Regions:
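Conserved, mostly hydrophobic/aromatic
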Residues: 106
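Long, low-complexity C-terminal extensions of enzymes
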Residues: 97-100, 109-161
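Catalytic alpha/beta core domains of metabolic enzymes, predominantly
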Residues: 1-102
Length: 161
């Protein structure tokens, strides 16, 4: 529908698809409108990472933009990165638990970084799903290059003043 609009060049597309977010950002969508191909790219996203690992999200987004602007295809390491980001988002947002632990998952990462004292939610029944804390530990250990823990530690005192 966006590609068929006369205002398509004024419309920015964003993705919140945590199952495939890096690939969404890398993809140039080509849709036939009448007899002409119209191309449109998603210009932003990485919602899971923006919630807890913002510095890493910026770095990922810059890599994605550089690859997309080069226009020479998608390097294998970007597909590996895509799978890693998807794995991390699954740990935080809890699709295995029907997304019941989404807010608590974000809070848990922020608590581990020292930015929150606990993972309390407005609804006291909203908490981590069974095994979710272990999943968060697993992904932060498996992909230390995608977390901001050292950066947060370096600035925590300054930010909490």
């Amino acid at each position: 529908a966006v590609c068929e609009s006369d205002r398509r060049d004024a419309i920015a597309l964003y993705t919140g698809n945590d199952d495939n977010i890096v690939v969404d950002l890398l993809t140039r969508y080509r849709i036939m409108v009448g007899n002409k191909p119209v191309e449109k790219s998603i210009v932003g996203g990485l919602l899971g990472h923006w919630a807890v690992w913002t510095r890493s999200a910026v770095e990922i987004f810059e890599k994605v933009r550089a690859v997309r602007e080069k226009g020479e295809g998608i390097p294998h390491e970007m597909l590996t990165l895509a799978a890693q980001v998807t794995d991390m988002n699954a740990a935080i947002f809890d699709p295995q638990g029907g997304f019941r632990g989404s807010i608590a998952g974000v809070h848990e990462v922020l608590r581990r970084q020292g930015l929150l004292e606990g993972i309390w939610c407005l609804n006291p029944n909203e908490t981590l799903s069974p095994g979710q804390a272990e999943e968060i530990t697993r992904v932060t250990s498996a992909y230390p290059h995608l977390v901001d823990d050292e950066f947060v530690r370096a600035h925590l005192d300054e930010w909490l003043k």
